[in-house]
């Protein structure tokens, strides 16, 4: 079944089912892209945006596969089981599925925000790609968790009582951050993960799509693509129900990105 040029499907064993969708490209492309989603509350907000980016890349001749991590989105499983090790298995499944379905020779990963932290560990444990693109990546997992905890406390304080005489749900012991399950194992994984030059031990070129006001990444970036100032923001101060769209300036950026990926020469 195809929906507007892309095909949804399940991947992985019955015990670890992942929702995925392939945005196919015409011809016999040699390069394909796996889109690694952001984490927690940033994933549903950017779902339409990531879908539009995948379609745009496919129209440029780059087949793109997007997926939901196990325990998130439309994938099976509970968010209580979410940690970086599970995400690494999911990346194995997603990259293998794209290779199998398209017979590409070169693999590119585009990782949004916290998804970049998962990609770092995936490379450490033997994940193989030809190019990594980090889209507004979270550089310091520990600092991000602290930011989320503070933002979560503010959000809880603003919640109205569910009904008269019932207190607000402000107790963080429910294990959630920004309304999504964030088990202790996931928090511990994120807190000890940073993007640094260790990624380059794997001889994979790394590009970054960042805003001008983003602090310099503590790693060598082979190529930097500036994100338009008016691009949708992942800032924790943004409205929780805000949905991202592929605005004309960002669409132009994705076009330049796709062209650059197609022109990139791999040894």
Regions found by a protein language model. Give the residues of each.
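N-terminal cap/lid segment of alpha/beta-hydrolase-fold proteins
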Residues: 1-31
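Short, surface-exposed "cap/lid" segments of acyl-processing enzymes
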Residues: 15, 24-68
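Alpha/beta-hydrolase active-site loop signature
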Residues: 40, 69-74, 139
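Short glycine-enriched, charge-decorated loop/helix-capping segments at active-site entrances
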Residues: 49-50, 78-83, 239-243
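Catalytic nucleophile-loop/oxyanion-hole region of alpha/beta-hydrolase
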Residues: 72-106
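Gly/Ala-rich beta-loop-alpha elbow adjacent to hydrolase catalytic centers
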Residues: 108-120, 136
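Active-site signature of alpha/beta-hydrolase-fold catalytic machinery across serine-
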Residues: 121, 125
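The alpha/beta-hydrolase serine catalytic core
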Residues: 126-267
């Amino acid at each position: 079944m195809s929906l507007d040029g892309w095909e949804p499907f399940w991947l992985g064993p019955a015990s670890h089912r992942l929702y995925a969708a392939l945005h196919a490209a015409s011809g016999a492309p040699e390069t394909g892209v796996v889109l690694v989603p952001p984490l927690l509350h940033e994933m549903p907000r950017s779902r339409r945006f990531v879908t539009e980016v995948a379609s745009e890349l496919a129209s440029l001749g780059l087949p793109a596969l997007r997926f939901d991590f196990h325990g998130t989105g439309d994938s099976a499983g509970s968010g209580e089981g979410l940690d970086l090790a599970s995400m690494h298995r999911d990346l194995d499944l997603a990259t293998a599925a794209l290779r199998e379905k398209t017979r590409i020779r070169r693999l590119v990963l585009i990782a949004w925000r916290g998804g970049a932290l998962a990609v770092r560990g995936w490379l450490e444990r033997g994940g193989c790609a030809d190019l990594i693109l980090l889209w507004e990546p979270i550089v310091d997992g520990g600092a991000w968790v602290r930011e989320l905890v503070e933002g979560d406390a503010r959000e809880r304080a603003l919640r109205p009582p569910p009904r008269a005489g019932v207190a607000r749900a402000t107790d963080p012991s429910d294990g959630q951050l920004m309304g999504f399950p964030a088990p202790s194992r996931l928090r511990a994984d994120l807190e000890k993960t940073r993007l640094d030059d260790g990624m380059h031990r794997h001889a994979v070129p790394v590009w970054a799509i960042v805003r001008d006001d983003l602090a310099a990444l503590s790693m060598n970036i082979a190529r930097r693509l500036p994100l338009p100032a008016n691009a949708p923001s992942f800032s924790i101060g943004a409205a929780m129900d805000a949905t991202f769209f592929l605005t004309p300036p960002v669409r132009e950026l994705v076009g330049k990105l796709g062209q650059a990926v197609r022109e990139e020469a791999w040894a």
